[in-house]
A protein has these predicted regions:
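Short alpha-helical hairpin
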Residues: 5-23
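Alpha-helical phosphate/pyrophosphate-handling elements in metalloenzyme active cores
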Residues: 28-58
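Histidine/acidic-rich helix-loop-helix segments that form or flank divalent-metal centers
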Residues: 2-5, 102-144
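Alpha-helical scaffolds flanking conserved acidic
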Residues: 53-65, 122-126
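Conserved small/polar residues in nucleotide/adenosyl-binding loops
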Residues: 149-155
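Helix-adjacent hinge/juxtasegments
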Residues: 55, 68-106
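Active-site metal-coordination segments of metallo-dependent hydrolases
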Residues: 27-37, 80-88, 123
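Residue-level recognition of specific faces of alpha-helices
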Residues: 12-15, 39, 61, 128
Length: 155
């Protein structure tokens, strides 16, 4: 990737550092989408010995890119995300991806297709880790944040 395009791409990814999720860290601050993506990628690496038949590189790529669309829309909690929200996020993400050079466009499109269909082992593991990380994070946060989490999306 050309240096200028790399910097542009990283600038979009940087937005995920400021995109907060609906849950809190154990220290009482809102978790970012970037932190969530980093942790499920680490989880993929740490459980890889349990799935020797899985392609670890593909799995880690899925974990890294799974929430890139939220760089454009922010995090909308799953329990509040509508079909219209999903379509908007997918459209904006696709528009951005089409500006990337090959082989990144094709590879990312294939990874997103696999993640959506959840037919491959890697896609099923990624989705399980995505859900598990959220459960772990909720359990690590103070119980007093639970009612706040429900109010956040209604503001």
């Amino acid at each position: 990737m050309e240096p200028e395009k790399l910097i542009e791409t990283l600038a979009v990814a940087e937005r995920l550092k400021d995109a907060t999720r609906h849950c809190y860290t154990s220290r009482g601050r809102r978790e970012s989408v970037a932190e969530h993506s980093w942790r499920i990628t680490l989880m993929a690496y740490l459980v890889s010995d349990e799935f020797p038949e899985a392609n670890l590189e593909k799995l880690m790529k899925m974990c890294l890119i799974h929430d890139l669309g939220e760089a454009f829309t922010g995090d909308i909690p799953t329990f509040e995300k509508s079909e219209k929200d999903e379509e908007k996020e997918a459209s904006l993400l696709n528009e951005w991806m089409m500006q990337l050079p090959e082989p990144f466009v094709s590879e990312m499109q294939e990874l997103y297709r696999e993640m959506e269909e959840r037919k491959t082992l890697e896609a099923r593991i990624y989705k399980a880790l995505d859900n598990l990380e959220a459960l772990i994070q909720h359990n690590e946060s103070d119980i007093s944040t639970r009612s706040e989490e429900r109010r956040v999306g209604k503001e």
